[in-house]
């Protein structure tokens, strides 16, 4: 079981840990929310340092840039590839071919710039309120969304690919365990505000459903790029939803 945790850390982060990878990579999906909680806590702690001297803009930038660093930029790269393929391609095969091209096109660049700007704005609002638990929750729920898509949609490439080992063996049990763990880790912080908890999970599920729908429509399934993209989009949706809650209520 711990081999799944080792695989999850090696897959989702820049950190190197001792131990053997799981024989079945889908078993690492159980641990995705746990790794997300660790990364979210790390980023929130890094944001606290500049915020302690009153520099909320830098605190927000630290979370955005730090998130790219600790994930090796893998998820952001997935978003760029997905944007280039989905909006710069044509038929299914052409779209998949573009997504495999390492070159970032105009749609990918626009997606990354929009992501960074919107994340910075949303996190700025959260740091101004000292909402570190919300920052961490966005990262956690981003990894939950990856599990939900992997467990519910087929792999799009017939020849397989980097993420096929995760998607091929995933099922309802992985989704249920990941969802339960996510609730267990977030509930202690938001049990006094069930509306906010509902809002966070609602934003995450909306992001997952949106990306899943687009991916099924465009390529008939998901790829590693799509799993990376859904993590980034979920973080953005969760942080924007939390920011709106602070603004409106």
From Swiss-Prot:
One of its GO terms (biological process) is cobalamin biosynthetic process. It is a multi-pass membrane protein. Its cofactor is Mg(2+). Its EC number is 2.7.8.26. Its main location: membrane. Keywords: Cell inner membrane, Cell membrane, Cobalamin biosynthesis, Magnesium, Membrane, Transferase, Transmembrane, Transmembrane helix. The chain crosses the membrane at residues 29-49, 50-70, 104-124, 131-151, 165-185, 194-214, 226-246. Disulfide bonds: none annotated. It catalyses: alpha-ribazole + adenosylcob(III)inamide-GDP = adenosylcob(III)alamin + GMP + H(+); alpha-ribazole 5'-phosphate + adenosylcob(III)inamide-GDP = adenosylcob(III)alamin 5'-phosphate + GMP + H(+). It is found in: Cell inner membrane. GO terms for molecular function: adenosylcobinamide-GDP ribazoletransferase activity; cobalamin 5'-phosphate synthase activity. It holds the Pfam family CobS. It is an enzyme of class 2 (transferase). GO terms for cellular component: plasma membrane. Pathway: Cofactor biosynthesis; adenosylcobalamin biosynthesis; adenosylcobalamin from cob(II)yrinate a,c-diamide: step 7/7. It comes from the Bacteria. Belongs to the CobS family. PANTHER family: ADENOSYLCOBINAMIDE-GDP RIBAZOLETRANSFERASE. Joins adenosylcobinamide-GDP and alpha-ribazole to generate adenosylcobalamin (Ado-cobalamin). Also synthesizes adenosylcobalamin 5'-phosphate from adenosylcobinamide-GDP and alpha-ribazole 5'-phosphate. HAMAP family: CobS. This is Adenosylcobinamide-GDP ribazoletransferase. It comes from Chlorobium phaeovibrioides (strain DSM 265 / 1930).
